[in-house]
Design a protein with these regions (language model features):
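Non-catalytic DNA-recognition/assembly elements of restriction-modification systems
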Residues: 1-22, 148, 153-159, 172-191
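Glycine- and charge-enriched low-complexity intrinsically disordered segments
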Residues: 112-132
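Short coil/turn segments at secondary-structure boundaries
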Residues: 24-32, 130
Length: 194
């Protein structure tokens, strides 16, 4: 979808939503050979997802559920309502099969602007209006809530987008190096304590 200054971008027209993987405690494995599952603790608002405390399961997600570089990972349900709606983006770290758990979702778009929209005040206000539950119940939002969000695109957005992307590229380079270091560390520890 082409975006122009002064237009309105609706997330449902710019991308799609993919539900997370449902699994049970019996599907969880100790090895890092299965599918890596990201949960709300792996989401930090506006930053790339973190790879700490991943859950590994012996279930195979469908093709659409496998995370791709640039996907937005969203907390869709949580006992703490302030965590619902928080979003990070996925940076491919070479994990063969990574997905999100059932209480999270994936927003996928080819439009580079959408990543930044999930960090906006407008997005956060919309999520606060949509949250269901809370007060002891699990608070949640629905895929339709995400896809219904519309953003007014200001004039000159291209210049700001270029600056944001340039800063982000530098940040991601450092993150990818860190991911590689962590992968080597994990491999060495696995070999050492067989």
């Amino acid at each position: 979808m082409n975006v122009t200054s002064g237009s309105v971008l609706k997330l449902g027209n710019a991308g799609k939503f993919v539900r997370g993987l449902t699994y049970s405690a019996s599907d969880v494995i100790e090895d890092t050979i299965g599918t890596a599952v990201m949960r709300s603790n792996n989401i930090s608002n506006g930053d790339p997802v973190n790879f700490e405390e991943l859950v590994w399961v012996n279930k195979i997600p469908n093709h659409e559920q496998i995370l791709r570089d640039g996907d937005i990972v969203i907390c869709m349900a949580n006992g703490s309502s302030h965590l619902v709606g928080k979003a990070s983006y996925y940076v491919d770290c070479g994990i063969e099969s990574a997905t999100v758990g059932a209480f999270c979702g994936i927003y996928r778009s080819d439009n580079p602007l959408t990543k930044w929209l999930f960090q906006s005040k407008h997005y956060k206000k919309h999520i606060q209006r949509c949250i269901q539950g809370g007060n002891g119940a699990i608070a949640n939002i629905y895929p339709e809530d995400i896809l219904a969000i519309s953003f007014n695109i200001p004039s000159g957005y291209e210049r700001v987008l270029n600056i944001l992307n340039s800063l982000e590229d530098k940040y991601l380079l450092e993150q990818k190096l860190l991911c590689r270091y962590l992968a080597v560390k994990s491999h060495l520890l696995a070999q050492m304590f067989i």
